[in-house]
Amino acid sequence: RRRIGIPLVRGGPLDVSRRAPHITHEFVLQEHAMTDQTTLDAIDKAVKANDVVLFMKGTPTFPQCGFSSVVVQVLDYLGVEYVSTNVLEDAAVREGIKAYSQWPTIPQLYVKGEFVGGCDIVKEMFESGELREFFQDKGVEVEAAA
């Protein structure tokens, strides 16, 4: 596993790990004291700077809840390249993402800056074939037929 430190708005490093070169890389927002607005700004920047972002409990290689695991499995099955944030690493991000989306639960999936939903919505869209079509409509490459 290769880790690369990249500066983040709040001055801390952004930890980037490549899980599989063609599938995903993950980032973890490091724990630092930050104001609510700073947290929201960092979340907004991450959501807008990446095509597909998953805020989850744990990491794609080690999900810490069943709901996060389901969304990771769906994204991996579709072969979608995505960025993930482990909200368990930073309480401010964990609470900030709920305020940002006005959605009370985690995981949360964003595509091209748009909030898609959590586990139930992603699973439902995947099972109906709508998720694959949604990614294609947004210009996100999908490798597998669903």
Predicted regions and their residues:
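Flexible, polar/low-complexity N-terminal or interdomain linker segments that lie immediately upstream
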Residues: 29-44
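Ubiquitin/ubiquitin-like proteostasis machinery centered on ERAD and p97/Cdc48
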Residues: 142-146
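Short, Lys/Arg-enriched N-terminal segments with co-localized hydrophobic residues
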Residues: 1-2, 6-33
